[in-house]
Each structure stands twice: as C-alpha cells, then as structure tokens.
Amino acid sequence: MAKIIDHLSQGEILAQMAEEPAEAAQAALKLRRALDDSNPTPKTIPKCWESLEEEIGDVMNCIDALLLEDALNYHTFMSKCGEKAEPKMSRWKQRLKARYAKNDDDAV
C-alpha cells in the first residue's frame, strides 16, 4: 500500500498536522463542558472522550505520515517527546504545589 508521503508533500502533511491539534482542542473543550455541566452540551461524557481520542489519533497519524510511516522513526520520535514531557510534568506539579501551599498558608 502506498504511503501518505507518496501523495502529499511534507508541507501538506505539516499543514494537516497543524489542523488536527486545533480539532483536538475543540474536543477537549467540549469534554470540559460535559464534565463541568455549567454550559451544557448534548454530547455525553463518553462521546466527548471518544471525540478527543479520535482527534488525538489524527494527530498521531500525521506524525506517522511525517515520519514516513516507519515504526522505528515513530517510536524514536514519541520517546523523545516523552523525554521532553517528563520534566514539564514535574515543573507543572511543582507550580501547583507551590500555589496550593501558598493558599494553605494564607488560610491560617
């Protein structure tokens, strides 16, 4: 079977890759509305999760196409992304800890 890169330029794949996170963002916001229920949506929470999974899957497909649909390239890229994400998660937790520790001190 032909690869995506056989039909679309790298630039076109990148354009698609820019669109898909925007769609994932919309799905995430819809899920937030479903969970929060202050601004109701007709979509159920499970359907909202399904939409978010689908859009993230589209992002993953774009990454795969950009990396020439090579499993090793994809795994390497995702591993590098994970390495970059790990310290960011740690910093995020530290910021939250600092903020809520400050709020606890203010309450005393």
Q: Where are the regions that the model predicts?
A:
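Flexible "arm" and connector segments at domain edges
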Residues: 1-108
